[in-house]
From Swiss-Prot:
Reactions it catalyzes: RNA(n) + a ribonucleoside 5'-triphosphate = RNA(n+1) + diphosphate
Coiled coil segments of this chain: none
GO MF annotation, one: protein dimerization activity
E.C. designation(s): 2.7.7.6
GO biological process: DNA-templated transcription
Written domain comment of the UniProt record: The N-terminal domain is essential for RNAP assembly and basal transcription, whereas the C-terminal domain is involved in interaction with transcriptional regulators and with upstream promoter elements.
Pfam family, one: RNA_pol_A_bac
UniProt entry keywords in alphabetical sequence: DNA-directed RNA polymerase, Nucleotidyltransferase, Transcription, Transferase
Superkingdom of source: Bacteria
Functional summary from the UniProt entry: DNA-dependent RNA polymerase catalyzes the transcription of DNA into RNA using the four ribonucleoside triphosphates as substrates.
Protein name: DNA-directed RNA polymerase subunit alpha
HAMAP family linked: RNApol_bact_RpoA
Family per record: Belongs to the RNA polymerase alpha chain family.
């Protein structure tokens, strides 16, 4: 770690205090499957930067369990039919691919990421068939008789039985990310007649984002990021965004080590942290009442800025548009305001002050403060 005297001082970045999550109206599955996230304000350009990175991490980086193989009594290969079962094995495989299982491989659980075999015995007698109208559906929930996996869609039909029988079914479940075709899946101790499946591990179905303009104080040149995430239920949208953020942080940490110099960001000034009366007393001060160079004072006077209130409500880019107003004057003014615990581009809306009425409001507040002093005197 470098000496703090070599740290670089950067101007503050506007950041959201928190990310707001809300349900999407009309979405199937509710907030457990579809949610909207809003982050604002962000510096111009950061909305697309964060939105694109999060979208990619959500689509390719998240992990979830999936069935990677199965075996069943009487099934020798994928291209056959089983007597007493309506679906052929090819259709059973397709149904298994649509099975959604939920579980997190915990760090303190030995072998938590290893593939697991889930075994089930399906016994169907004549009374079961009669109660079901002659065709008994076997669902994903029926096959999860052991293990700690939870079925997201337990009513999902795997196959349909038409005569009394007893079947032994084995499902092998593994964790992964993205999509893996069957030829890329390597199984340890693969059993005879064990059929390997294509596996869709990614729990994220769809990610959309867009960026809107938003304001900070009187400055509208900021971004609002709106991110909409849809999952299949194996991971909730809120969890998905949190996991994607951690994945990105892990990768960015590699680049963070490239230079010993560290950036220290200036703190944003919050009006809430200061006593309102103290701030008002500063805002009504005339420009000529603070120690500025003649050049800076003249620049502000030429721009018809008479009070500190008129100055601090002004966004930095707008100040630079005034005639003869350069970087040197800007730096001097920012340093002086920092000494006063003020800054450019402040939001004074809680005082009823905006760019359109700041001059009149400062006069009104100045008169109010003078009247208050005279009354106390």
């Amino acid at each position: 770690m470098s000496d703090s005297s070599h740290n670089l001082l950067y101007n503050k970045f506007e950041l959201p205090e928190s990310v707001k999550m809300s349900p999407v109206e009309g979405a199937v599955g509710g907030i457990d499957k579809v949610a909207r996230f809003v982050a604002d304000p962000l510096e111009k350009g950061m909305g697309h930067t964060l939105g694109s990175a999060l979208r990619r991490a959500l689509l390719i980086g998240l992990e979830a369990p999936a069935i990677v193989s199965f075996s069943m009594t009487g099934v020798l290969h994928e291209y056959m039919a089983v007597e007493g079962i309506i679906e052929d094995v090819t259709n059973i495989v397709l149904n298994l691919k649509g099975s959604l299982l939920k579980k997190y491989p915990l760090q303190d659980c030995e072998g938590g990421r290893c593939s697991q075999k889930l075994r089930a015995t399906i016994s169907i007698d004549a009374s079961d068939l009669a109660a079901a109208g002659g065709q008994k559906e076997v669902t994903l929930g029926d096959l999860l008789q052991e293990g700690t996996f939870e079925a997201v869609n337990p009513e999902h039909v795997i196959f349909t039985v038409t005569r009394p029988m007893q079947l032994e079914v084995m499902l092998r479940v593994a964790f992964g990310r993205g999509y893996s075709p069957s030829e890329r899946i390597v199984l340890e101790e693969r059993g005879m007649n064990e059929i390997v499946l294509d596996a869709a591990f990614s729990p994220v179905v769809l990610v959309n984002y867009f960026v809107e303009d938003t304001r900070v104080g009187q400055d509208t040149d900021f971004d609002r990021l709106v991110l909409q995430v849809e999952t299949d239920g194996r991971v909730a949208p809120k969890e998905a965004v949190a996991f994607a953020t951690q994945i990105l942080s892990k990768h960015f940490s590699v680049f963070e080590k490239m230079d010993e110099k560290r950036i220290v960001f200036e703190e944003a000034i919050s009006v809430e942290k200061e006593n309102k009366d103290d701030i008002l007393h500063k805002l009504v001060l005339g420009i000529n009442e603070i120690e500025l160079s003649v050049r800076s004072t003249n620049c502000l006077s030429n721009a018809n800025i008479e009070t500190i209130g008129e100055l601090v409500i002004m966004p930095e880019p707008r100040l630079l548009q005034f005639r003869n107003f350069g970087k040197k004057s800007l730096c001097e003014i920012k340093n002086k305001l920092k000494e006063m615990k003020l800054e450019l581009g402040m939001d004074l809306s809680q005082f009823g002050v905006g760019l359109d009425n700041v001059k009149e409001k400062m006069k009104w507040y100045a008169e109010k403060i003078r009247s208050s002093k005279n009354t106390k005197g």
